């Protein structure tokens, strides 16, 4: 008789408590939910209390230097915690683990486990390595891993919205970006597992899913491309809202826009990172599109969905950026009229093409000034966008009690704008019709239409 040796050994967790902190993008949030699922299967118990934890995992981001500096600071705090609890196991997982394995495993960091984004299945074994007195390390990248069959443990307790990772990795190699080096090549998850996960969420009361990938538009398994996947998920129920992030402008197809326009429960919001408004700058960034191409895609979005929100990412002070190129970014912002933007100073990342070949030659004070100008303009654009919504009516999916008052609820429009309104008899998870009566640059305020 064949016996599975692993089935005979005690579970690694044996009731030990796991605490996880997540930094960075939505993909990391989804990854943390996968990690908790893997660890619970090994007998670990998830806790939201750091003080109760026997093992702490920090899921990290390497997209900018300040993201990594936050982690180093957090590690210092964890080392102080260990003085009170010497048995505490500390692990660094995710992109920073992949990028900085050597530094993290040096003496004095306090790190016991280092695990990259493709090695989460190995975490129980890495804990056993630590139990045996060694450091547990696995940062091997995979060409196949998608964690497709693992049911994530939903850590956001609102029970309304959930993330579903549909692919991993990136093949674009933008010159400034570390992601292809920390997350590996693109791999698309089997479509049926994605649809099954979305259906299970809906049956369990969730009313919104966000399909995640570094570039969702390049998703493909067999005959199923991203527009087809989006359609199939939306067909689960008209009561299930479907969002996605993130899109690469070079891959936004008319087929996708037609699919979005044809199905009311596919949210009318597209995150379309521009990074710069200058074609020459975009060439240095290896973005594979021009300003003219980007604006044509924006025009197509408006043509198919006049009410679609468009948001973006912008970088101030990339290598060799001239004042004219900076002004081109400001003019692009005005021409598009973004509803919202994530805006950053350029942070050179070791190992990227830009670091190896272009340098980081824009003075910090110039970067700061240019970023300030971008932020000030976007604040005006966001406020103008919100003011245009005053008097309009939207269907809101209620997500939570408002931070302003327990007597108010908040939820988002299809365009991903947050709306605050009086609670009345409504509950989290309800769809509510709201008329917008006022706004700030970040929030809409409304009244329920009976």
Q: Which residue stretches match the model-derived regions?
A:
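Proteins enriched for Cys/Gly/acidic motifs involved in redox and nucleic-acid/cofactor modification
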Residues: 1-217, 255, 270, 292-303, ...
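Thr-Gly-centered strand-to-loop micro-motif
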Residues: 22, 47, 284, 341, ...
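Conserved SAM/AdoMet-binding glycine-rich loop
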Residues: 90-94, 99, 104, 203-324, ...
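Glycine-centered loop/turn positions within well-structured domains
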Residues: 121, 172, 217, 279-280, ...
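Short flexible coil/turn linkers enriched for glycine and charged/polar residues
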Residues: 156-160, 170-172, 266, 276, ...
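Conserved, mostly hydrophobic/aromatic
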Residues: 174, 194, 211, 244, ...
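Terminal RNA-binding accessory module
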Residues: 354-450
């Amino acid at each position: 008789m064949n016996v599975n040796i692993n089935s005979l050994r005690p579970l690694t967790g044996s009731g030990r408590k796991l605490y996880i902190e997540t930094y960075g993008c939505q993909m990391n949030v989804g990854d943390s939910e996968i990690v908790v699922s893997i660890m619970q299967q090994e007998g670990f118990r998830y806790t939201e209390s750091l003080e109760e934890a026997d093992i702490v995992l920090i899921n990290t981001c390497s997209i900018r230097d300040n993201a990594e500096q936050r982690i180093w600071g957090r590690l210092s705090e964890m080392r102080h915690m260990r003085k009170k609890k010497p048995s505490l196991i500390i692990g660094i997982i995710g992109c920073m683990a992949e990028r900085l394995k050597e530094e993290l495993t040096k003496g004095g960091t306090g790190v016991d486990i280092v695990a990259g984004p493709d090695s989460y299945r190995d975490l129980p074994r890495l804990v056993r390595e630590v139990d045996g007195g060694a450091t547990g390390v696995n940062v091997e990248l995979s060409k196949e891993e998608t964690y497709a069959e693992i049911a994530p443990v939903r850590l956001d307790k609102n029970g309304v919205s959930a993330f579903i990772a549909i692919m991993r990795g990136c093949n674009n190699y933008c010159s400034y970006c570390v992601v292809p080096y920390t997350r590996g090549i693109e791999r698309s998850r089997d479509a049926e597992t994605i649809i099954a996960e979305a259906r299970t969420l809906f049956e369990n009361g969730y009313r919104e899913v966000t399909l995640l990938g570094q570039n969702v538009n390049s998703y493909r398994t067999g005959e199923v491309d991203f527009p087809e996947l989006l359609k199939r998920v939306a067909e689960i129920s008209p009561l299930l809202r479907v969002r996605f992030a993130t899109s690469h402008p070079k891959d936004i197809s008319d087929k996708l826009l037609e699919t979005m326009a044809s199905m009311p429960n596919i949210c009318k919001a597209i995150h379309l990172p521009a990074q710069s408004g200058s074609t020459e700058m975009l060439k240095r960034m290896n973005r594979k599109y021009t300003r003219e191409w980007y604006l044509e895609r924006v025009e197509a979005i408006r043509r198919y969905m006049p009410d679609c929100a468009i948001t973006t990412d912008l970088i101030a002070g990339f290598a060799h950026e001239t004042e004219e190129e900076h002004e081109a970014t400001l003019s692009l912002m005005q021409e598009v009229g973004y509803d919202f933007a994530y805006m950053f100073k350029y942070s050179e990342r070791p190992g990227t093409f830009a670091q190896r070949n272009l340098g980081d030659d824009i003075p910090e004070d110039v970067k700061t000034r240019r970023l300030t100008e971008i932020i000030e303009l976007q604040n005006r654009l966001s406020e103008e966008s919100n003011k245009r919504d005053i008097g309009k009516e939207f269907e809101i999916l209620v997500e939570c009690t408002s931070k302003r008052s327990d007597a108010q609820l908040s939820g988002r429009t299809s365009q991903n704008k947050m709306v605050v309104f009086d609670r009345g008899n409504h509950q989290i998870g309800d769809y509510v019709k709201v008329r917008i009566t006022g706004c700030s640059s970040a929030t809409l305020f409304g009244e329920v239409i009976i």
